[in-house]
Design a protein with these regions (language model features):
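Conserved catalytic-loop aspartate of Hanks-type protein kinases
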Residues: 103
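Conserved activation segment of eukaryotic-like protein kinases, specifically the C-terminal portion
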Residues: 76-91
Length: 302
């Protein structure tokens, strides 16, 4: 890939159709990632590679986490993730129970940057970042606060004084109604009210691409199982050993599958051969009788 989205946005060379295509591809990629039970946790323009055809690839999965094998009681996340400007409210507020909806907030921040050419929430600290977010989303109600699942939420929100909520239309005067609708659905303080990736792909903003390339939108057949605990910090040597052990285990599993397949093929081949031989043995006498019968008829016919 030639460059990244951060550089392209700063260059101000993207046409509206390019922005739509970039957003569609981003959602399409996240559809697969989230279906695998993976949360990227560090989505931002500099982690989206792009070429001259406006084709993108998501990179840097260094902070990605698996959430499939964890139970409801597990503390699944640390709050130190992602560049601050693209962090979801639940991450900023120290929640340890957030999910793939945190990625969707980051998508909203990226979308806003595509539309306006500059970051939406360039906070200088966690509190300042939260203040900038609430200026757009408005102060959360009790339901929204409970959805964050963090004891810090109530106190931090109460310490922020919002003079006047900013309207998206005012912030994005050139944006269309459809663009503002998608942006508003992505930038919901409450993660339960935030649009998910499947819903976003159905949104009118990317509808044309979604209809055209629907067959290429794939989901992971089954969630990715991580055999190394995400909640344990290992040394480099330990990581190497665990990865090596996992590779050996997978290699043995693949060999076993191949052996089973070969056994089935051999069994089916032998069965087929026996079937043909049995049929041939049964049919040969009938063919001989027919020939003799023809000879007899021919003889008396003279």
């Amino acid at each position: 890939m030639e460059t990244d989205l951060h550089t392209v946005i700063r260059s101000n060379i993207l046409e509206p159709i390019h922005k739509q295509f970039v957003m569609y591809q981003l959602l399409k990629a996240l559809k697969f990632i989230h279906s695998a039970g993976i949360v990227h946790r560090d989505l931002k323009p500099s982690n989206i590679l792009i070429n001259s055809d406006a084709c993108i690839k998501i990179c840097d999965f260094g902070l990605a986490r698996s959430v499939i094998s964890l139970t409801g009681k597990d503390i699944i996340m640390t709050d130190y993730v992602a560049t601050r400007w693209y962090r979801a409210p639940e991450v900023l507020l120290g929640s340890t129970k957030y999910n793939s909806q945190a990625d969707m907030w980051s998508v909203g921040c990226i979308f806003g940057e595509l539309l306006n050419g500059k970051p939406m929430f360039p906070g200088t600290s966690t509190l300042n970042q939260l203040n900038k977010i609430l200026e757009v989303t408005g102060k959360p109600n009790k339901e929204d606060i409970l959805s964050i699942q963090s004891e810090l939420t109530q106190n931090m929100v109460e310490n922020i004084n919002i003079i006047k909520q900013k309207n998206l239309k005012t912030l994005f005067p050139k944006a269309t109604a459809i663009e503002l609708d998608l942006l508003g659905r992505l930038l919901q303080f409450n993660p339960n009210k935030r649009i998910n990736v499947l819903e976003a792909l159905e949104h009118p903003y990317v509808a044309d691409f979604h209809e055209q390339y629907a067959d290429s939108e794939i989901q992971c057949e089954k969630p990715i199982q991580i055999h190394i605990s995400d909640n344990t910090k290992y040394t480099v040597k330990e990581y190497k050993q665990k990865l090596f052990d996992d590779l050996l285990k997978r290699k043995k599993e693949v060999r076993k599958k191949i052996m089973n397949m070969n056994m089935k093929i051999n069994t089916n081949t032998n069965t087929h051969k026996n079937y043909i031989n049995n049929n041939n043995n049964q049919q040969q006498p009938q063919q001989t009788l027919k020939v003799k019968k023809k000879k007899v008829i021919s003889k008396y016919g003279k």
